[in-house]
Amino acid sequence: MNLSKTLKHVYQEAKVSDLFPVTHLNSPSIFESQSGLVGSVIKVNGAAFEIEEADTLNHQRFLLHQALVSLDSRFIIYVTTHRQKISCPLIGEFKQGFAKDLDERYQQRFQDKNLYKNTLYITVVLKGDDSSKTGSWLQWAKSLSIKGNSELSEHHREQNIQTLNRVVEQLQANLNPFGATILGKQDEALGFSELLQFLGLVVNAGQTTSFKHPVYSPPIANSIPQTFKQEAKYPEGHLGQYLSSCQLLFGECIQFQGNTQQDCLFGAMLSLKKYPTNTASILLDSMLSLDCEFIATHTFAPIGRDSALDTISKKRSKLLSAEDKALSQTTALSDLEDGIASETLLLGAHHHTVMLLAPNKSLLDAAILEATKRYGSAGIVVVKETLGQEPAFWSQLPCNQHFITRASLITSQNFVDFCPLHNTQTGFSNENFLGGAVTLLETPSKTPVYFNYHARGSKTNPSKGHAAIFGGNNAGKTTLVNFLDAQIGRFGGRSFFIDRDESSKIYILASGNSSYIKIEPSNPIAMNPLQLPDTSENRSFLKSWFATLVQEESERVIPSHIAEIINDCIDYSFEQLAPEFRTLSHLSQFLPVDFPRWPHLKRWLKRNDSRIDGEFHWLFDNQHDSLNLDFDKVGFDVTYLMDQVHSVIATPVYLYLLHRMRQCLDGRLTSFIIAEAWQLFASPFWEKALREWLPTIRKKNGHFIFDTQSPKTITDSPIKHIVLDNLATLIAFPNPLADRETYMEHLKLREAQFEAIKENTPESRIFLYKQDHEAFLCKLDLSGLSQYIRVLSANTQSVKLLDDIMQEVGHDPELWLPVFYERSKK
């Protein structure tokens, strides 16, 4: 082919700008087409639907219909759903070790799988009054070059822009429950044009680009950076020449060809051919979990009231002339007629396409089959466009309604059912003081969910972050709790564990810079609270602590005369005794012989000439205090305290541990993780401690995480209101025996959320994650990470294996972890 023929083919090739209707922006939020149509775009977060009951969905439908029914035949409405693959990087850094390795492997899973985000847009185009005499006259005036007519046309254009602005701002206000914002309003803060980004979606296969353009290129410049120093968000010239960044090839499928062979995507156009018998707002929800990228477009062009009534009249006449006895049809027509006459309904032309996108043709074919199947299950017939492929493609763009070939008249209620603004929710990643999410979870719809313990709040002050995790044995609670603790390490915090059955021992010790203490007689720990430094806070604590040592089982407060003796004794020990002499046995020598609680105190004392070792002497009657909390993670196994001793024995231990933990609150993010909390909620000590700590500890950047089998352990507790009112996060694993009253009345779950807990199986590993009014069905997918799971959740056998390995190679996790990974596989 010679050069002249090549040039001829180039000139004959259709330009994107010839078919791209939008030519320029009138303002950051208003675009205009070649034919003078003006439009604006509203971005919508959407409404949750996956675990919402019918009443909620119906109310959302009502709100949306009320918002749209205010538009008349001067407008065309486009609802666009853009489903796009995304990556979700998380901020924060891990120290070297187990948590860093786990995070790298876990994040790799998200890079290797398809995760999607659905973004919804409503485009409102003002096409003007093209049916009236005024509209026809203005069209005629535009064709004349008379100065007066041009001025009149310009005046009419300005009026259209004002009308559009007013209508779109009102629509945005009405759609506030759906999280609506007008594109272009935040351009200055973002540094690019949101509206241009949206307008470029279709011609760029859904690939979003933050377009920037140099204002000018001076003929002489000192350097290249100076040449491009100034940038504009809004280009000059035809937008169609500016927005397209790839070559469009139409054939068996649509090919979006970039500058390299690998930079290529394939698309297919599906169009709605046959409508379902009935519509509902859940009609096309299954498309929001389709495993491919797509752009779905619904167009609705209301017709005038008189035209609509005339159309209904003609339809009724046809039924009567055909002697069609279908009473339901004539009744429906009468209802429709009433709705249109009273302006509570609209009748309009509807058109729907979906452009499926894939990196190769085989994946595209699979997407076509799956999408067709999902439409079919909703009673809808769609066809893959062949001859009509190119018109269907260009019809997705606002102001290209002349390319629509498969429009049908439907009501505004039907239109709302086709595009109810449903969307999968993703949580938040940067809306509290941490500046990022703890981790990323996955929904059954293959959309990501940002997990946070803390509620939305100030960027400078800690928000509440207490959490309750409910699940039966083997539900996966321990694995999840420890995984989340490893992930929150990205913020450099610390954790204290009140553990049971050593279930978190392996994880804590694997984390490095950690300590794990099993509190039981066979593993005595040398604690001596009397060795605390002499401060008013410590003196006050020791007086309360000593009182618990001699408390009766049924006693909440000791008698005042006994308290006075104890207080004097504590003061004397600090004022008269050197630290090395402040032991429980030594202090007891200063108590009067007739001290009424000697029998209670002796059980805590070591032997001397006049007594044998008390049963619990190993706990506190020690020469030195070896309790060291200067670690990133500290675990206490308190199974012995939970199962084998009365609460009057456990209380002094808990009291001292919590006092020392409280003194560690230095502003670092601190997690208190309570395993099998159901046993602690029954304790008078914990009732008092939590009543005091839960409302206030956030001020020191602390939060509690309660792991328990049933919500009833909280709802039956005397402090249920303190706990529930201060919870920021709730996680519930499936429970076939879930009690409706407990979950719905006390935990404030909705019907659909409760049913999800009751109907899913524990084997599914799906759980409900709830924060405030948002709820998500999530799954922690650790498949392929079995060696990490064996660390995150321990059992008797694996703990014994760990103990044996540490005896062999030492306590450094860098030494014992590889050995544990290998041996625990067996």
Give the residues covered by each predicted segment:
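A short helix-turn-beta junction within AAA+ P-loop NTPase domains corresponding to the substrate/partner-engaging
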Residues: 513-514, 719-732
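P-loop NTPase motor domains
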Residues: 47, 54-73, 286-289, 380-381, ...
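Glycine-rich phosphate-binding P-loop
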Residues: 460-484
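Conserved P-loop NTPase
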Residues: 750-803
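Pre-Walker A adenine-sensing motif
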Residues: 447-460
